[in-house]
C-alpha cells in the first residue's frame, strides 16, 4: 500500500515508459539526459551541504538586494539635495546674494528623510515576517496530512477528462520508489477492485472521520504553539532589548572613562603648565613686591611733601582767584565809567563849542546893531569883508571843484572797499548814514526857511528889545536919559543908521539865501547819489538771493550725497552684512559630509587647522618596544584654548582632527600669523597617565600668499633628546574667506571707521581750538564769506555724573544730536565712564536765509546721551534742549546744562559750546537788534570803534532748585545780559505767548547766569518834535546805571494760557499805547528787546517819522519764584524800568508723538509685525510720520519716538488751514474732525517688497479740546485695532497744543460761529 521511505529511492535509475506512451520519444531525450546528468551531479553532494549552499546563496541575494536598495535611496537623496542646492544657488545669484529663505531647516529635513527610511525598512520587515508566518502555517498543514494509497478518487460520471490512471499511475511509481520490470505488471485485474471496493470505501470513510478529529486536535495544538511562539518572541525581543541596553551602557561607560582619562590628562598638562608659570610669576612678583615696598616708602615721603605744598598752593590760588575776581569786577565797572565819562566829555565839548559860537554870533549881532560910534570902522570892515567874500567865493568854487574830485575819488575808493569787505552790510551802513545826514539837512533847511520869513520891522523890534534887556541887565540907566534928551536931535541920524543896518542885514540874508540854494543843490546831488546807491543795493540783494537759492540747491544735493555716503560708511563699519560661502568638498572627503553655509560678520574669518596623521620612525619602535603605542596631540592657537586630538593607537595614527577658530582679521592677527608659530606636542597615554614624547612647531605664514587648503609637514623632535628624528606630522590649514578679500574688507572697515571718527579730537587740540576760536569770530565780522554761507561750530566737551540704568555698572556713553536739516551726528563711545570727556567738534555750513533764521528763533537743539551697553533700544540716559535764539543775534552759547532721563529725573550734566565762525547776518526779511543798532552807530562812530568786541556768553552752574509746574519740575535759570552798545533805547518784557514749547523730556535745567550783549533800538523821532526833545531823550539814554535782564522762555519754563492772559494784562497796564506799533518777532523762544518792524525797508522808510523812546541800560539778576506757573511778572523783577511791550504769539498747532505702548493682544503675538512707526494726519493735509521705525515693544513696555511737528495757521499765509479750523469749530460733517494717529507696521529689511500695514488708530478731537479749554500735554490716548473689530491694543503718549490757534480762529469768526 505504501511506498518505500528511503530518501534516495527517487534517485535510482528506472525505466521510464510513461513518456514514450504519449508519443514524445526522441524529442525529450536531450532534456532527460540533461536532467539526469544534473541529478547525478547533485546526488554526489550531501543534502545538508546543498541546503547550506542554498541558504547562503539566498541570504547573499537578500543582502545584495538590501544594499542595492540602500544605495539607490542614498543616490536619490543626494540627487534631491544636489538639485535643491543648485536651485538655491541659482535663486541666490538671481536675487544678488540675499539672505537665505526663512523657515527652512536642513537638519530637520535630514531627520525626516532618515525616519522615512526607517519606516520603509520596518514595513519590509513586517511583510517578510507575514510571509514567513504564512509559509509556516502551510508547512504545518502539509505535515499533518496523512498519505493514502490513492492519489485521487475517480469520478462516477464521465466528465470528458482523461483519467488519471492512464498517464499518472505509472509516473507515481518512480516517485514513490516502486520498481516495475514490465509495463504489464502495472495493470490490476478489474475483478479484484470490485471485490474489495466496498470494504475499502468504508475503511476510508472511517479514516476520514478519524482524520477530521485529528485535524481539529492538530489545529488546537497549532493555536497553542502559535501562542507559545508569540510569547517566546516577546521574551526574545525583551532579552534582545536588555542586551542592547547593557551593551549601550557598557559602551557609554567605556566612552566616559576614556573621555575622563583624556580630560584628566589635559587638565594635568594645563595644571602642570600653570604651575610652572605661577611659580615663575610668583618669584617675579616677590621681587617686584620688595621693590614696590621700597618705592612706596619713598613715594609716601614725597607724597606728603607734595600734599603740603599743594595745600599751600591751593590756598594761594584761592587768594589769587579772589583778587582776580575783584580786580575784574573793578575793571569792568571802570570800563563802563570810562566810556560814560568819555561820552559825556565829548558832549560837553560839543556844547561848549556851540555856546562859544552862539556867544560870538550874539556879540557880533549886538555890535553891528547898536554901535554907532564904530560905523566908519564897520564900513571899512564891510569893504574888507566884501573883498574877503569875493575871495571866499572863488575859494569856495575851487573848493567845490576839489570837493567833487575828492568825492569822486572817495566814491571809487568806497567801491573798491565794498568789493573787498561785506558789500551788502557796508551799503546798508552808508545808506543809513546818508539818510541821517539828509534828515539833519532838512531840519536845518526848515530852520533857515523860518529865519528867512522875518520882516525888517520885526527885526528892528527884536533888536530894540534885545538892547533894552541888555541895558537892564547892565544897569546902565544913564544911556536912557541921554537917549531921551537927544531923541529929537538925532532922529534922522538914527533912521539913517537903521536903514543902513537894514540894508546890511538884507545883504547878509541874500548871501545866506545863496548859500542855502547852493546847499540845496548839493543836497539834491547827495539825494541822487543815495538813490543810485539804493538801486545798486537792491540789485545786489537780488543777485545775492539768486546766489543763495543756487547755494541752497547745491547744498541740498551735497547733503543728500553726504547722507548716502555716511549710510554706506556706517554699513561698512558697523553693518551686519554677512559673508556666505560653501565649504570646499575635497576628493578625499566623504560623500555624506554635512553641507552647511557659515555666516560671518564683516571683518570676521574662520581659520581651520587640520591634524591629519603622525608617522613615527623605526627608531621610536626600537626605543619604546611598544608596537602599537597609544598617542594624542595638543596645541594652542592665538589666544584660544588648548585643543586635544582623539586618542589613537598605532605607529601611524590618523587623527583627522579639525579645529575651527572665529577670528577678526586685524593688525594683531596678521602679525601673529606672519611671525609666530604654535607648538604641537605628542603625548603617549598609559591608562590614566600620559607622557610628552615629542614636539614640533607649526607655521602659518604661507596663508598670506596662498588661498585654499595649504598642506604642510613638520618634523617631530623627541623631548628626551635621544631620538633626533622622531617622526613627521602631516597637517593642513586654511582661511574660509581668502586672505586678499579679508584684508580688503578689513581695510574698508578701517577706512570707514576713520572717516566716521575723524571728527574726534584730542583734549589738547580742542583746547588750542577753543583759544583760537574767539579770534576767528572777531575777525570774521570784517572778512568776506563765500556768498551768504556761514559755519556753526558745535563742541561737546564732556558729561558729568552720568548713571547707567543698571546701578551696579558704569555706562558706555555717547551723545547724538541733529541740527537743522543735517543728518544725525553722534560722538565717539567712551567705555565705562560716569564723567566722559568727549571733546567732539563738528561744524555745519549753513546758508543765512529765512528758514535758518526761523529755525534758530523757534527751535531748540536736543542733545541725547545714550548708553551703548544698554540692551534695551531707544532708551536714553539723558536729554537736554538748548535754545538757539542767541545764535540768531550773533552770540555764542556756552554752558553746562542739566540732563534729564525719560522719567523726568536728573541724570547729570553736559558741557556744550555753540558759536559762529563768521558774524551772523540775518536775512533781508528779518530785522534784528543788530540791524537797528547800525542806525545809531553812524552818529558816534568813534565811540563804537573804541568799544571792545562782543564777549561770549559766560555761564556759571549753580545748585539745581526744583520748581513746581504743570508737569515739569525744572531748575530756574538766572539770566543777565550785558549791552553790546553803549546805549539801549527801549526795554521790553518777555512776550507772554509767542514762545517755543519746551520738549517734555526736559524737566531740570541748570540755573545759569548769562552776561549777554544787547543792541539798542531805533529811536522814534516824531516830525513835530523839536530839537530840545531830541536832546532831552538823548540825555535820558545816559542816565540809567542798571542793565535790563531778559529771559528766554526756552531757558525757564513752559507757558500756560493762564499765565499768558495774566502777562497780557500786566503789559497792557504798563504800556497800552505802543501795542499797535509792535510787530511779532520771528522768534518763538526769546524776547527781542524793543519794537521791531517786519522788514528792514519798512523800518528805514518810517525812520524820519519815528518817535524817540527812552530806555535804561540796567544790569540786574532776577529769578522766578518756584511757586509760579508762568514767567516772572513785572512786580517780581527788581531791575526792570521803562516800557514793556506785548507781542502776539505765533499761531500754530504743535503735535508731538512721544511714546507707544502695547498690551496683550493679537498685535503683540503676531510675529510678522516686527517694527512700528506712527503716522499723523490733520484733515486733508499730507501725513507726517516719525522718521524711524522702532522694534515692537513687549506688553507693558514703552518705545520712545520723541518726534514733533508744527502746523502754522497764521492769517497771512495759511488762510486755508484757518478755514479748516473754522469748520471744525462749527462742527460740520467733515471726514476728519480730529487728528488721526495711525500705528503702521514696517516690513523687515529682508522683505522690502512687502507693503506697510495699518495696525492701530487713535484720534484727538480738536473741537472737544476747544470746549474743555486746555491743551493735551503728555496724555495717553487709546489705540484701537485697525484690522479687527476695533478693540484696544495699547496707548499712545502725545502732546497736542492747538488751543491758542483755535481761540484765535474763534475770535476772528465769532459772528459766524455764534450765528
Curated annotation (Swiss-Prot):
GO CC terms: axoneme; bicellular tight junction; cell-cell junction; centrosome; ciliary basal body; ciliary transition zone; cilium; cytoplasm
UniProt keyword list: Cell junction, Cell projection, Ciliopathy, Cilium, Coiled coil, Cytoplasm, Cytoskeleton, Disease variant, Joubert syndrome, Meckel syndrome, Repeat, Tight junction
UniProt-listed InterPro entries: C2-C2_1, C2_dom, C2_domain_sf, RPGRIP1_C, RPGRIP1_fam
Record Pfam families: C2, C2-C2_1, RPGR1_C
GO annotation, biological process: camera-type eye development; cerebellum development; cochlea development; corpus callosum development; determination of left/right symmetry; embryonic forelimb morphogenesis; embryonic hindlimb morphogenesis; establishment of planar polarity
Basic and acidic residues composition bias: residue spans: 1028-1044
Segments forming a coiled coil: 64-144, 197-256, 326-555
Effect of residue 199 to G: Found in a patient with Leber congenital amaurosis
Subcellular location per the Swiss-Prot or TrEMBL entry: Cytoplasm; Cytoplasm, Cytoskeleton, Cilium basal body; Cytoplasm, Cytoskeleton, Cilium axoneme; Cytoplasm, Cytoskeleton, Microtubule organizing center, Centrosome
Gene Ontology MF term list: thromboxane A2 receptor binding
Domain C2, chain residue ranges per copy: 577-713, 773-897
Biased composition (Acidic residues): 1060-1083
Protein's job: Negatively regulates signaling through the G-protein coupled thromboxane A2 receptor (TBXA2R). May be involved in mechanisms like programmed cell death, craniofacial development, patterning of the limbs, and formation of the left-right axis. Involved in the organization of apical junctions; the function is proposed to implicate a NPHP1-4-8 module. Does not seem to be strictly required for ciliogenesis. Involved in establishment of planar cell polarity such as in cochlear sensory epithelium and is proposed to implicate stabilization of disheveled proteins.
Illness the protein is tied to: Ciliary dysfunction leads to a broad spectrum of disorders, collectively termed ciliopathies. Overlapping clinical features include retinal degeneration, renal cystic disease, skeletal abnormalities, fibrosis of various organ, and a complex range of anatomical and functional defects of the central and peripheral nervous system. The ciliopathy range of diseases includes Meckel-Gruber syndrome, Bardet-Biedl syndrome, Joubert syndrome, nephronophtisis, Senior-Loken syndrome, and Jeune asphyxiating thoracic dystrophy among others.
Family membership: Belongs to the RPGRIP1 family.
Quaternary structure (record): Interacts with NPHP4 and NPHP1; NPHP1, NPHP4 and RPGRIP1L are proposed to form a functional NPHP1-4-8 module localized to cell-cell contacts and the ciliary transition zone; NPHP4 mediates the interaction between NPHP1 and RPGRIP1L. Interacts with IQCB1; the interaction likely requires additional interactors. Interacts with TBXA2R (via C-terminus). Interacts with RPGR. Interacts with NEK4. Interacts with NPHP4, INVS and DVL2; the complex is proposed to be involved in DVL2 stabilization.
Full protein name: Protein fantom
Gene: RPGRIP1L
Amino acid at each position: 500500500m505504501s511506498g518505500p521511505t528511503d530518501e534516495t529511492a527517487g534517485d535510482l535509475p528506472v525505466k521510464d515508459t510513461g513518456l514514450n506512451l504519449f508519443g514524445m520519444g526522441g524529442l525529450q531525450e536531450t532534456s532527460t539526459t540533461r536532467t539526469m546528468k544534473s541529478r547525478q551531479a547533485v546526488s554526489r553532494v550531501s543534502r545538508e551541504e546543498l541546503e547550506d549552499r542554498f541558504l547562503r546563496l539566498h541570504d547573499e541575494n537578500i543582502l545584495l538586494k538590501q544594499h542595492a536598495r540602500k544605495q539607490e535611496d542614498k543616490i536619490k537623496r543626494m540627487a534631491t539635495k544636489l538639485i535643491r542646492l543648485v536651485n538655491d544657488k541659482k535663486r541666490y545669484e538671481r536675487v544678488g546674494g540675499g539672505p537665505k529663505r526663512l523657515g527652512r531647516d536642513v537638519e530637520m529635513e535630514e531627520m525626516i528623510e532618515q525616519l522615512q527610511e526607517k519606516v520603509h525598512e520596518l514595513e519590509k520587515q513586517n511583510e517578510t515576517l507575514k510571509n514567513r508566518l504564512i509559509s509556516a502555517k502551510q508547512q504545518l498543514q502539509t505535515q499533518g496530512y496523512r498519505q493514502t494509497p490513492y492519489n485521487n478518487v475517480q469520478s462516477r460520471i464521465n466528465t470528458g477528462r482523461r483519467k488519471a490512471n492512464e498517464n499518472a499511475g505509472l509516473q507515481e511509481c518512480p516517485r514513490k520508489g516502486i520498481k516495475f520490470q514490465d509495463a504489464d505488471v502495472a495493470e490490476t485485474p478489474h475483478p479484484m477492485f470490485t471485490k474489495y471496493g466496498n470494504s475499502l470505501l468504508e475503511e476510508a470513510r472511517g479514516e476520514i472521520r478519524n482524520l477530521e478529529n485529528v485535524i481539529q486536535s492538530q489545529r488546537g495544538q497549532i493555536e497553542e504553539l502559535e501562542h507559545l511562539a508569540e510569547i517566546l518572541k516577546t521574551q526574545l525581543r525583551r532579552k534582545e532589548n536588555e542586551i542592547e541596553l547593557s551593551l549601550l551602557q557598557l559602551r557609554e561607560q567605556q566612552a566616559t572613562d576614556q573621555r575622563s582619562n583624556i580630560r584628566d590628562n589635559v587638565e594635568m598638562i594645563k595644571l602642570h603648565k600653570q604651575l610652572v608659570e605661577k611659580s615663575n610669576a610668583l618669584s617675579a612678583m616677590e621681587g617686584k613686591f620688595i621693590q614696590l615696598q621700597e618705592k612706596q616708602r619713598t613715594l609716601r615721603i614725597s607724597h606728603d611733601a607734595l600734599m603740603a605744598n599743594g595745600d599751600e598752593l591751593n590756598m594761594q590760588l584761592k587768594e589769587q582767584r579772589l583778587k582776580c575776581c575783584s580786580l575784574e569786577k573793578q575793571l569792568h565797572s571802570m570800563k563802563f565809567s570810562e566810556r560814560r565819562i568819555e561820552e559825556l566829555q565829548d558832549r560837553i565839548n560839543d556844547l561848549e563849542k556851540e555856546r562859544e559860537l552862539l556867544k560870538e554870533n550874539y556879540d557880533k549881532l549886538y555890535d553891528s546893531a547898536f554901535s554907532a560910534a564904530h560905523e566908519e570902522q564897520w564900513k571899512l570892515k564891510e569893504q574888507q569883508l566884501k573883498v574877503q567874500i569875493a575871495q571866499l567865493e572863488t575859494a569856495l568854487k575851487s573848493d567845490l571843484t576839489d570837493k567833487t574830485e575828492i568825492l569822486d575819488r572817495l566814491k571809487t575808493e568806497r567801491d573798491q572797499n565794498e568789493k573787498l569787505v561785506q558789500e551788502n552790510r557796508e551799503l546798508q551802513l552808508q545808506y543809513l548814514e546818508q539818510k541821517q545826514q539828509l534828515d539833519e539837512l532838512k531840519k536845518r533847511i526848515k530852520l533857515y526857511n523860518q529865519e528867512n520869513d522875518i520882516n525888517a520891522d520885526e527885526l528892528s523890534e527884536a533888536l530894540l528889545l534885545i538892547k533894552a534887556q541888555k541895558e537892564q541887565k547892565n544897569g546902565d540907566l544913564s544911556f536912557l536919559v541921554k537917549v531921551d534928551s537927544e531923541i529929537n536931535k538925532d532922529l534922522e541920524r538914527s533912521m539913517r543908521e537903521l536903514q543902513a543896518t537894514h540894508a546890511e542885514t538884507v545883504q547878509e540874508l541874500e548871501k545866506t539865501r545863496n548859500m542855502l540854494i547852493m546847499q540845496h543843490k548839493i543836497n539834491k546831488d547827495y539825494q541822487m547819489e543815495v538813490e543810485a546807491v539804493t538801486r545798486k543795493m537792491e540789485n545786489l540783494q537780488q543777485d545775492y538771493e539768486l546766489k543763495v537759492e543756487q547755494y541752497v540747491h547745491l547744498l541740498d544735493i551735497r547733503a543728500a550725497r553726504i547722507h548716502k555716503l555716511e549710510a554706506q560708511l556706517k554699513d561698512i563699519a558697523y553693518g551686519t552684512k554677512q559673508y556666505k560661502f560653501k565649504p570646499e568638498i575635497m576628493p578625499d572627503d566623504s560623500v555624506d559630509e554635512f553641507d552647511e553655509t557659515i555666516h560671518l560678520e564683516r571683518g570676521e574669518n574662520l581659520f581651520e587647522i587640520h591634524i591629519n596623521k603622525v608617522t613615527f620612525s623605526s627608531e621610536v619602535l626600537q626605543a619604546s618596544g611598544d608596537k602599537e603605542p597609544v598617542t594624542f596631540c595638543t596645541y594652542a592657537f592665538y589666544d584660544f584654548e588648548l585643543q586635544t586630538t582623539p586618542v589613537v593607537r598605532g605607529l601611524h595614527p590618523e587623527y583627522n582632527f579639525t579645529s575651527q577658530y572665529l577670528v577678526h582679521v586685524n593688525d594683531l592677527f596678521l602679525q601673529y600669523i606672519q611671525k609666530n608659530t604654535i607648538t604641537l606636542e605628542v603625548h603617549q597615554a598609559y591608562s590614566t597617565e600620559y607622557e610628552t614624547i615629542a614636539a614640533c612647531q607649526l607655521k602659518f605664514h604661507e596663508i598670506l600668499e596662498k588661498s585654499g587648503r595649504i598642506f604642510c609637514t613638520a618634523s617631530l623632535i623627541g623631548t628626551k633628546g635621544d631620538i633626533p628624528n622622531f617622526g613627521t606630522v602631516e597637517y593642513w590649514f586654511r582661511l574660509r574667506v581668502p586672505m586678499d578679500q579679508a584684508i580688503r574688507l578689513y581695510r574698508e572697515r578701517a577706512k570707514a571707521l576713520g572717516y566716521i571718527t575723524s571728527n574726534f579730537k584730542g583734549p589738547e587740540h580742542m583746547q588750542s581750538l577753543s583759544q583760537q576760536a574767539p579770534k576767528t569770530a572777531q575777525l570774521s565780522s570784517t572778512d568776506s564769506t563765500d556768498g551768504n554761507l556761514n559755519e556753526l561750530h558745535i563742541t561737546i566737551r564732556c558729561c558729568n555724573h552720568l548713571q547707567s540704568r543698571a546701578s551696579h555698572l558704569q555706562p558706555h556713553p555717547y551723545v547724538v544730536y541733529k541740527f537743522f536739516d543735517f543728518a544725525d551726528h553722534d560722538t565717539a563711545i567712551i567705555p565705562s565712564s560716569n564723567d566722559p570727556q568727549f571733546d567732539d567738534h563738528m561744524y555745519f555750513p549753513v546758508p543765512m536765509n529765512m528758514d535758518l533764521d526761523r529755525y534758530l528763533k523757534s527751535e531748540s537743539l536736543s542733545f541725547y546721551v545714550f548708553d551703548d551697553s544698554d540692551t534695551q533700544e531707544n532708551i536714553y540716559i539723558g536729554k537736554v534742549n538748548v535754545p538757539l535764539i542767541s545764535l540768531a543775534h550773533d552770540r555764542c552759547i556756552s554752558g553746562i546744562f542739566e540732563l534729564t532721563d525719560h522719567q523726568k529725573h536728573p541724570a547729570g550734566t553736559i558741557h556744550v559750546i555753540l558759536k559762529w565762525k563768521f558774524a551772523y547776518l540775518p536775512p533781508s526779511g528779518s530785522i534784528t537788534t543788530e540791524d537797528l543798532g547800525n542806525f545809531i552807530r553812524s552818529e558816534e562812530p568813534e565811540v563804537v570803534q573804541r568799544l571792545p568786541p562782543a564777549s561770549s556768553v559766560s555761564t556759571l552752574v549753580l545748585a539745581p532748585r526744583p520748581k513746581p509746574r504743570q508737569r515739569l519740575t525744572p531748575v530756574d535759570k538766572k539770566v543777565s545780559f550785558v549791552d553790546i552798545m553803549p546805549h539801549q533805547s527801549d526795554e521790553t518784557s518777555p512776550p507772554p505767548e509767542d514762545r517755543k514749547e519746551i520738549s517734555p523730556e526736559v524737566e531740570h535745567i541748570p540755573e545759569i547766569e548769562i552776561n549777554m550783549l544787547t543792541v539798542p533800538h531805533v529811536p522814534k523821532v516824531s516830525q513835530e518834535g523839536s530839537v530840545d526833545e531830541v536832546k532831552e531823550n538823548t540825555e535820558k539814554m545816559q542816565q540809567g546805571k542798571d542793565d535790563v535782564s531778559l529771559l528766554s522762555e526756552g531757558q525757564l519754563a513752559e507757558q500756560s494760557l493762564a499765565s499768558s492772559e495774566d502777562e497780557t494784562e500786566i503789559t497792557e497796564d504798563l504800556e497800552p499805547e505802543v501795542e499797535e506799533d509792535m510787530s511779532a518777532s520771528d522768534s518763538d523762544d526769546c524776547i527781542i528787546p524793543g519794537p521791531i518792524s517786519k522788514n528792514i525797508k519798512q523800518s528805514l522808510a518810517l525812520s524820519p517819522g519815528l518817535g524817540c523812546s527812552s530806555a535804561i541800560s540796567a544790569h540786574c539778576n532776577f529769578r522766578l519764584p518756584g511757586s509760579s506757573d508762568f514767567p516772572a511778572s513785572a512786580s517780581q523783577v527788581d531791575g526792570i524800568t521803562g516800557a514793556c511791550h506785548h507781542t502776539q504769539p505765533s499761531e500754530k498747532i504743535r503735535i508731538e508723538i512721544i511714546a507707544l505702548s502695547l498690551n496683550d493682544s493679537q498685535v503683540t503675538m503676531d510675529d510678522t509685525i516686527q517694527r512700528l512707526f506712527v503716522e499723523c494726519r490733520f484733515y486733508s493735509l499730507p501725513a507726517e510720520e516719525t522718521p524711524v521705525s522702532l522694534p515692537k515693544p513687549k506688553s507693558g513696555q514703552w518705545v520712545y519716538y520723541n518726534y514733533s511737528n508744527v502746523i502754522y495757521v497764521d492769517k497771512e499765509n495759511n488762510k486755508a488751514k484757518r478755514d479748516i479750523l473754522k469748520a471744525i469749530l462749527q462742527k460740520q460733517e467733515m471726514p476728519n474732525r480730529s487728528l488721526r494717529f495711525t500705528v503702521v507696521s514696517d516690513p523687515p529689511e529682508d522683505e522690502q517688497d512687502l507693503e506697510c500695514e495699518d495696525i492701530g488708530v487713535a484720534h484727538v478731537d480738536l473741537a472737544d479740546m476747544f470746549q474743555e479749554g486746555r491743551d493735551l500735554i503728555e496724555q495717553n490716548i487709546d489705540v484701537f485695532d485697525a484690522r479687527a473689530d476695533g478693540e484696544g491694543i495699547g496707548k499712545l503718549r502725545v502732546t497736542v497744543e492747538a488751543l491758542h490757534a483755535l481761540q484765535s480762529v474763534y475770535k476772528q469768526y465769532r459772528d459766524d460761529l455764534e450765528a
